[in-house]
Swiss-Prot record:
Oligomeric and partner information: Octamer or nonamer in membranes. Monomer in the soluble state.
Protein name: DELTA-actitoxin-Afr1e
Position of the signal peptide: none
Taxonomic superkingdom: Eukaryota
Gene Ontology MF, one: lipid binding
Marked site positions, Protrudes from one subunit (B) and inserts into the hydrophobic cavity from the adjacent subunit (A): V60
Binding site for an N-(acyl)-sphingosylphosphocholine 3: W116, Y137
Binding site for N-acetyl-D-glucosamine 6-sulfate: Y51, R53, Y138
Function as written in the Swiss-Prot or TrEMBL entry: Pore-forming toxin (PFT) that consists of a crown-shaped octamer or nonamer that forms cation-selective hydrophilic pores of about 1.5 nm (inside) and 13 nm (outside) and causes cytolysis. It causes cardiac stimulation. Also causes hemolysis (HC(50)=1.6 nM). Interestingly, the Phe-16 is crucial for hemolysis.
GO cellular component: extracellular region; nematocyst; other organism cell membrane; pore complex
UniProt-listed SUPFAM superfamilies: Cytolysin/lectin (SSF63724)
Domain remark from Swiss-Prot or TrEMBL: Composed of a long N-terminal alpha-helix and a core region rich in beta-sheet structures. Before the pore formation, the alpha-helix binds the lipid membrane, partitions into the lipid-water interface and stabilizes the monomeric molecule on the membrane. Finally, it traverses the bilayer, thus forming the transmembrane pore.
Length: 179
């Protein structure tokens, strides 16, 4: 399949070059993000929803992501002369009955804010919403988009490793693997 937002690709193929291609497809937008999430969890993921605190996406969240595959997604600030970034949470139901949630935050104003990201497994099925955003952004030790790799145990037999840059043209690459 093509390296475009909304696609599911082989997990081994996920990398910065693919995410840059997804990002460039958004064109000349001041605040945008390309997201790639590699499923090496041993579980199948089914899309639930994306909650946008600010910004939007023209892309439908890839519906099924099998083990060994990676999803590609994007987001951008709202069109027009509005001072917003692109901030949201993606939620996937996993075949074990739990929910994988991924936060991304690309602010408009870097004088006051930085890029942030987070990943967490919730018990049971939970759709992304404002409450989940607040929890992941303020209370669950998010990672700064600091051009470095970060790892964390997610519980439920899983761990994550991810990278986010510090630019307004952001890339977020996350690998979810068996612990």
């Amino acid at each position: 399949s093509a390296d475009v937002a909304g696609a599911v690709i082989d997990g081994a193929g996920l990398g910065f070059d693919v995410l840059k291609t997804v990002l460039e497809a958004l064109g000349n937008v001041k605040r945008k993000i390309a997201v790639g999430i590699d499923n090496e969890s041993g579980r199948t993921w089914t899309a639930m929803n994306t909650y946008f605190r600010s910004g939007t996406s023209d892309i439908v969240l890839p519906h099924k992501v099998a083990h060994g595959k990676a999803l590609l997604y994007n987001g951008q600030k709202n069109r027009g002369p509005v001072a917003t970034g692109v901030v949201g949470v993606i939620a996937y139901s996993m075949s074990d009955g739990n929910t994988l949630a991924v936060l991304f935050s690309v602010p408009y104003d870097y004088n006051w804010y930085s890029n942030w990201w987070n990943v967490r497994v919730y018990k049971g099925q939970k759709r992304a919403n404002q409450r989940m955003y607040e929890e992941l952004y303020y209370h669950r030790s998010p990672f700064r988009g600091d051009n470095g790799w970060h790892s964390r145990s997610l519980g439920y037999g899983l761990k994550s490793r991810g990278f986010m840059n510090s630019s307004g043209h952001a890339i977020l690459e996350i690998h979810v693997t068996k612990a």
